[in-house]
Amino acid sequence: MNRKSADFFFKIGGNADIFVKLKSVEQIEKTIETTRKIGVPLKFIGNGSNILVKDEGIRGVVAKICTSTYDFIDETTLRLDSGLLNAKVARILLDHSLAGFEFASGIPGTLGGAVKMNAGAYGSEMKNIVVSTRYIDLDSDKIEIKEINNAEHEFSYRHSIFSNKNAIIIDTTLRLQTGNKGEIEEKLCNNLDNRRAKQPIDKPSAGSTFKRGEDFITAQLIDECG
């Protein structure tokens, strides 16, 4: 299936030669195996909410990760597929009165993308709730699922080991806290209202474009430039 990159968040860019949606680990593994066998380039994406595509498009196969299952390990710990949208994860956790993910509910994109960039907002970030992540190393000749713990993610500001690693995240295990459902929902609503007030969420936008400086506010510098 040919897919226009302009269908994604920024509404720009050329077509992908072949566009597929992958809904299981088996489909992910088979796609890697097949493209390697026939020598076709393969590019994985999440929700397409944090990428810019050139007008010439993308050669080869673009595979969108659409996995969407989750399993509880115990009352406050669960493993979630990387293809789940952050908004969906927030809803799942709200339904089970689990707190700790509210900060990410309005961040566009998938859980896999949030882990990759150590997404954060309102004083919280993914490194605070990630237990482990399973992934496939695309530089390895062998197609196998590996797992790393929290420390091995090498989390830092908007960065993880996956930022510079050619890998596809399969799923992530999160540990949350038992909370009050009403309070969690109120926090979710407040965070979303705050985003609506400060960001043009009805326009092509991926939220923040620039990293925060250590001793300056990026937005202030842009304003001062005129």
Locate each region found by the language model.
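Structural signature of FAD isoalloxazine-binding scaffolds in flavoprotein oxidoreductases
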Residues: 13, 18-25, 52-70, 116-149, ...
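Short, well-ordered alpha-helical segments in soluble proteins
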Residues: 93, 111, 115-119, 134-137, ...
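Non-catalytic surface loops within mature trypsin-like serine protease
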Residues: 67, 82, 137, 176-178, ...
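Contiguous, small/hydrophobic- and glycine-enriched helical/loop subdomains that border
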Residues: 72-77, 81, 86-87, 100, ...
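A generic local secondary-structure boundary/capping motif
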Residues: 51, 90-93, 102-105, 118-125, ...
